[in-house]
Amino acid sequence: MQPGAALNLRLWLCLGLLQGLANGYSMTPPTLNITEDSYVIDTGDSLSISCRGQHPLEWTWPGAQEVLTTGGKDSEDTRVVHDCEGTEARPYCKVLLLAQTHANNTGSYHCYYKYIKARIEGTTAASTYVFVRDFKHPFINKPDTLLVNRKDSMWVPCLVSIPGLNITLRSQSSALHPDGQEVLWDDRRGMRVPTQLLRDALYLQCETTWGDQNFLSNLFVVHITGNELYDIQLYPKKSMELLVGEKLVLNCTVWAEFDSGVTFDWDYPGKQAERAKWVPERRSQQTHTELSSILTIHNVSQNDLGPYVCEANNGIQRFRESTEVIVHEKPFISVEWLKGPVLEATAGDELVKLPVKLAAYPPPEFQWYKDRKAVTGRHNPHALVLKEVTEASAGVYTLALWNSAAGLRQNISLELVVNVPPHIHEKEASSPSIYSRHSRQTLTCTAYGVPQPLSVQWHWRPWTPCKTFAQRSLRRRQQRDGMPQCRDWKEVTTQDAVNPIESLDSWTEFVEGKNKTVSKLVIQDANVSAMYKCVVVNKVGQDERLIYFYVTTIPDGFSIESEPSEDPLEGQSVRLSCRADNYTYEHLRWYRLNLSTLHDAQGNPLLLDCKNVHLFATPLEANLEEAEPGARHATLSLNIPRVAPEDEGDYVCEVQDRRSQDKHCHKKYLSVQALEAPRLTQNLTDLLVNVSDSLEMRCPVAGAHVPSIVWYKDERLLEKESGIDLADSNQRLSIQRVREEDAGRYLCSVCNAKGCVNSSASVAVEGSEDKGSMEIVILIGTGVIAVFFWVLLLLIFCNMKRPAHADIKTGYLSIIMDPGEVPLEEQCEYLSYDASQWEFPRERLHLGRVLGHGAFGKVVEASAFGINKGSSCDTVAVKMLKEGATASEHRALMSELKILIHIGNHLNVVNLLGACTKPNGPLMVIVEFCKYGNLSNFLRVKRDTFNPYAEKSPEQRRRFRAMVEGAKADRRRPGSSDRALFTRFLMGKGSARRAPLVQEAEDLWLSPLTMEDLVCYSFQVARGMEFLASRKCIHRDLAARNILLSESDIVKICDFGLARDIYKDPDYVRKGSARLPLKWMAPESIFDKVYTTQSDVWSFGVLLWEIFSLGASPYPGVQINEEFCQRLKDGTRMRAPELATPAIRHIMQSCWSGDPKARPAFSDLVEILGDLLQGGGWQEEEEERMALHSSQSSEEDGFMQASTTALHITEADADDSPPSMHCHSLAARYYNCVSFPGRLARGTKTPGSSRMKTFEELPMTPTTYKASMDNQTDSGMVLASEEFEELESRHRPEGSFSCKGPGQHMDIPRGHPDPQGRRRRPTQGAQGGKVFYNNEYGEVSQPCTEGDCCPSAGSTFFADSSY
């Protein structure tokens, strides 16, 4: 190294030290009790130096650098380093104590901070120089070699123990004295001499005089050296590990200029003990010199571990190299994860490393295993490297480490998870791109990846040109595999797909040893060409499959058709049409195969391929027909005007694929029938028949192509007419019931182009016509008797099949069951519960918010996983008891569950979905969830968006028509179940799932409310009530608050006693101990406690008023008191709402007839409202309504005074005259004159009844009542309990009262306790798409009528909250 380079190295080291000082060593330095720069004592004296500082301290002194001695004596000297008491500013203190000092103790004494590497005088260290004067031994240096190099001057280290001596430097030929200029003396370092003065010296020695005695130092042998050191290395290069007791050998080698001299110095732990030995070596090479120093320590111990530093110095350059020596007490193996137990890679990676953190000595043997199988090849114990990662690389890798000599063994396992980008397998195989129109097609995507793709997304786009690109790795793939660069892809749904979608399902399937995701898109009707793609994604990639879904009317895109379709007859015109899809094929050609060329010389048949068809066939001239506008196919027609036997043979149509350029062929064999003259296989024979018998004559013909067979009677052409039948291509003549005039000569004539053949026979008729008439009478009589017995047997059979009490089906609403023979509680015990059909696991039911709660029950919104037998999650409502419910309440809820099961499903009734009855949890009844809440609140919210005649979407109109047509179809089919409409509506929606899963066409909160909607709601409620009435179930609380609105404008009847407290509901008025919905109750229910289907019809009329007033409360402003009840009984009614059309007004008026028998049945209401809904004509109704509205204030409001006896139908009228509708009062186009009670006339037209009084025209007498919590109503008026008692006693017979329903009468003794049943209804609100619930319930008291369903005393009924 050049001198300039050495200078730069020194500057760099100085800057590094200053940088370290600036960065962290600006601190308070330690202080010594000896403040002098040098300190002089005499030999044999003791030396004590104390050092204090802010950090732990350590001492070094001559011959003991960096040796830590704490509180003990050295083996050679009597020096001691121990702790002393510090101060508050410098809490750490160390004292160095030397007893019996000698001259060799002369030198520099350093105190420094122990744990700070940088030793900077005045910053992290403090020192002083101590002279131990020995007048007998003033020189203390040892014999040494002095390397003389090219420096200007150098120090001769003649160290002295006495400062201030006069020193002379002598060589073999000269002596030098310090002159203060070129030759300098320093008591601490020796004498500095110019280098040129020493080049001729062989040795050097210092001389001094003390007293009268001369003293000489030890000799310095002078050695002239080279100037430059090249490199230094310490072997082993890495850290060295040993066990206690082993031998340490370190080799420090320097490469230097030829004939250079180097001084080695080792620095290592335990240097003071001088246990190490180092041996210098020198090897001269031709161009340089290698100098080494080998350090050896036998029987290493824990004290020998640490850094070992080798320093080489030639006087100009100083090289250092270090290594770390680790000494272990005993053999060990330690291994742990470096990046965790699970590592991930992706298939296709070039390599992956499985690293471990390993520490072991001695180095153990090792082996890598994969899934318990040894991994071959050379590997590293610190990391296993895998190249070209594939899915097969995944597994559990284990590193086994062992040291047999020490009996050590360790294992560690790592799991490698190889993520595989998803891949769709159908892309590997060719798939059809042509699909027949109106066919059912299934598109499949089977994907595999790691992790497994959770779902498959389907998209479609219209069949329009789209730019494509080819994937680089699949350049030769056909065009259909290129991915379109289009942005107009749409997600496939079952509603807005261009082709009707039957189903879209995805599932996991075990295929070829792997779990694969399979998705099938089933297209119900292929109508329109489109492009489909399926997309699968996981966390490391995605894959897509493009499907060109081209729809054509040609099967497989290529076909041959012939006219005529059967084998042609000689002489006929034949046309062979080759039809090919333009999108797929081009270059249509006709060939006729040459029979002579289809065999080789030996007569063996040749292999016929479409590619070489031209070698065996003759091309034919054909006509390419012009395609119709919009057609996507081409037709090449081969016409043969008059086919002959020689035209028989194979005809081939050849087409060429547009993309692959491959040729495809279809072959048609044309068979020609030779024309021959017709012949009869049997001649006609003469016949003798009786009058009224049947006659049959046959004219069987043999021979091909018989174009004409004609029959003659008495030379007159015989044609097919009543009683005469010609069949089997006119080969058979039949005459039913022969008459005398049918006698005569019959001729059969058969002709074709080759000629004609005839056959004739005579027919004679005998007997009289009267005999035939008698036979007719006998036949008719026999038929009548047979029909009579058939009807009788049918009635007997139906009576035997009448369901027993154990088979009673009833509603789950606020129903009354007939306890005439068996009490309700016993009936419920007879009902069974099929757990295999209805039990639903609780763990798949996630309960949500409480929709409503009452005194002992609550209704909760919940998510049910798989309740529709699929994998979807559906929102349901769950009824359950509150904590602390009694056993009777539990039995009541269980009884209601059984009733719900036996009543069955209906589209317009909230239906049961399942139940949780197992004893490991609460009893829960699961019913449908209706997202739009009750109808009353919905109508109120939609008032602002009411648009009577807004145009409905085609989908909504289709649903409306389906409802009406389904109801009429069920009516026409005797015995059809009410489930039919429910199922048919769901199928119309394109789904076969249960009612809760009907997909809604649009959000009802966003669409306007129309007059058509109001009629539709009314029709559906009537339909649901018809269903309940057919089950002999009475609702008793039919109101808009108990009608729920679901998706797709479907309304459902409900009544939720479990979740309502009617004691807090203003619509219920207290009557004695019961609360009653008086505004909705019929007069016979208020006064006589009679509840029948006819009383439900009255409530339906009030419900109509609510609907057409958009959710208003009935009888607005009317006080609900005794006067109200009396006037209601006397015939006063509500005025119709302004939105009600004349037809709706008449329906209301009929429902509010005072005579229950005069009210229409629900089946009549269904037909009337269905015709009204189906007929349309809303603008005409509006004009009629406006015209009526102008005169409503003084004339008919649609609600006139109707006496309970205003309608008179005599027995004669009832027997003689068919029922007819008063079409002058009801619009015929809506009603079609369908009759129902209350608007019938027999024979003659009955004049209209007198005008009905309304509450608006005749205000009630003002009465002030103090409102209380017991009897408040929504109008703010109440009817006191005492008034009810008075009103009831006033109209009750003295001994008993009569409860009449249609055709029934029941006398109940006075004082008979009223059976009570729980009553409940939901109160819901919806605003902004949310549903709010205010559910309450209570109790009512009522007797029941014969033939209808009534609960026994104490029976409790429950229904769903909001459903």
From Swiss-Prot:
Activity control: Present in an inactive conformation in the absence of bound ligand. Binding of VEGFC or VEGFD leads to dimerization and activation by autophosphorylation on tyrosine residues.
Residues with glycosylation annotation: 33, 104, 166, 251, 299, 411, 515, 527, 582, 594, 683, 690, 758
Stored InterPro entries: Ig-like_dom, Ig-like_dom_sf, Ig-like_fold, Ig_I-set, Ig_sub, Ig_sub2, Kinase-like_dom_sf, Prot_kinase_dom
Ranges for domain Protein kinase: 845-1173
Topology, Extracellular side: 25-775
Biased composition (Basic and acidic residues): 1307-1317
Tissue: Expressed in adult lung and liver, and in fetal liver, brain, intestine and placenta.
Catalysis performed (reactions): L-tyrosyl-[protein] + ATP = O-phospho-L-tyrosyl-[protein] + ADP + H(+)
Gene Ontology biological process terms from the UniProt entry: blood vessel morphogenesis; lung alveolus development; lymph vessel development; lymphangiogenesis; negative regulation of apoptotic process; positive regulation of cell population proliferation; positive regulation of endothelial cell migration; positive regulation of endothelial cell proliferation
Positions of the catalytic residues: 1037
Similarity comment text for this entry: Belongs to the protein kinase superfamily. Tyr protein kinase family. CSF-1/PDGF receptor subfamily.
Notes on the domains: The first and second Ig-like C2-type (immunoglobulin-like) domains are sufficient for VEGFC binding. The fourth and fifth Ig-like C2-type (immunoglobulin-like) domains are sufficient for homodimerization. The fifth and seventh Ig-like C2-type (immunoglobulin-like) domains are required for autophosphorylation and further activation.
Name of this protein: Vascular endothelial growth factor receptor 3
Organism annotation: Mus musculus
Gene that produces this protein: Flt4
